[in-house]
């Protein structure tokens, strides 16, 4: 079975600085690959390369078996759902209009769009009767993130990209959103690439974890394998789970 996304010795550099170094990685159908790393490790750069916001300086990146440089840019982006930390909802559009935007651009008829919007809102835990006509300013941070996830799923994309989507909400809401993500993964079976610097989140959500350090892929492992790894960078992240402040 061919990979949905494949990095083939892909590097990205700005001037003399290597942001990503010879990344080779396959993301298989239906899996959630979590890219874990410190700030500046290249996680978001890798994500932007998948949907054609950036292109490899060397090597190549394939989506559905085709190099991103060979895709029509619009078709590539519309085939990928993207969820980011600040959501990026259009403030002058209602929730329903935001979620239905890409299906409308794809030429879906209005009854089909309404059905899809209502179904997705319900699946992310928002009652369509209460939320479809609201504007983003009328939503909490957690509710906006749920709308962002629904929008990403709306046109049935090949792959979903999540760039630290839950980092700006409180811990209780964050756990609720993580549980919702796991439920959606079970229901939709979508291939996902999820970026985080939170090792707890990586262990909870990942099928496999790709550990990036200073632009290099240090380790690819299941959550269980990651917890047993002796790799120094993996141990540094796992130590965050164990540390407790000294009690006076």
Regions found by a protein language model. Name each.
Residues 134-139, 143:
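Conserved ABC ATPase signature
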Residues 156:
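Conserved catalytic motifs of ABC-family nucleotide-binding domains
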Residues 214-215:
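Conserved ABC ATPase "signature" C-loop
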Residues 96-104, 114, 118:
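Short helical segment in ABC ATPase nucleotide-binding domains corresponding to the A-loop/adjacent helical element
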Residues 67-81, 105, 110, 226-230:
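ABC ATPase NBD coupling module
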Residues 51:
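Helix-to-loop junction immediately C-terminal to a conserved catalytic motif
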Residues 160-163:
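Catalytic Walker B motif of ABC-type/P-loop ATPase nucleotide-binding domains
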């Amino acid at each position: 079975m061919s990979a949905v996304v494949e990095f083939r010795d892909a590097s990205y550099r700005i001037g003399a600085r290597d942001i990503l170094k010879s990344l080779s990685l396959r993301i298989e159908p239906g899996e959630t690959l979590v890219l874990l790393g410190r700030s500046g490790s290249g996680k978001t750069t890798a994500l932007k390369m998948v949907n054609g916001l950036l292109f490899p300086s060397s090597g190549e990146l394939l989506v559905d078996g085709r190099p991103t440089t060979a895709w029509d840019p619009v078709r590539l982006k519309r085939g990928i759902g993207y969820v980011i930390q600040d959501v990026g909802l259009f403030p002058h559009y209602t929730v329903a209009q935001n979620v239905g935007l890409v299906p409308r651009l794809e030429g879906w008829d209005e009854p089909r769009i309404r059905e899809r919007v209502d179904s997705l809102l319900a699946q992310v835990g928002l009652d369509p009767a209460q939320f479809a006509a609201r504007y983003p300013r009328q939503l909490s941070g957690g509710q906006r993130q749920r709308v962002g996830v629904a929008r990403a799923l709306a046109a049935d994309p090949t792959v979903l990209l999540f760039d630290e989507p839950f980092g700006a909400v409180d811990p209780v809401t964050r756990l609720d959103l993580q549980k919702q993500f796991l439920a959606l993964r079970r229901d939709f079976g979508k291939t996902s690439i999820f970026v985080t610097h939170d090792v707890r989140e990586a262990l909870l959500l990942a099928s496999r974890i790709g550990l990036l350090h200073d632009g290099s892929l240090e380790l690819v492992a299941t959550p269980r394998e990651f917890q047993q790894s002796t790799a120094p960078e993996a141990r540094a992240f796992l130590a965050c789970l164990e540390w407790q402040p000294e009690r006076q």
